[in-house]
Curated annotation (Swiss-Prot):
It is found in: Secreted. GO terms for cellular component: extracellular region. This is Carcinustatin-18. May act as a neurotransmitter or neuromodulator. One of its GO terms (biological process) is neuropeptide signaling pathway. Belongs to the allatostatin family. It comes from Carcinus maenas. It comes from the Eukaryota. The modification Leucine amide is found at residue 8. Keywords: Amidation, Neuropeptide, Secreted. The lineage of its organism: Eukaryota, Metazoa, Ecdysozoa, Arthropoda, Crustacea.
Amino acid sequence: SDMYSFGL
C-alpha cells in the first residue's frame, strides 16, 4: 500500500 511494502 506504500513504497516500502512494494505495492502491497
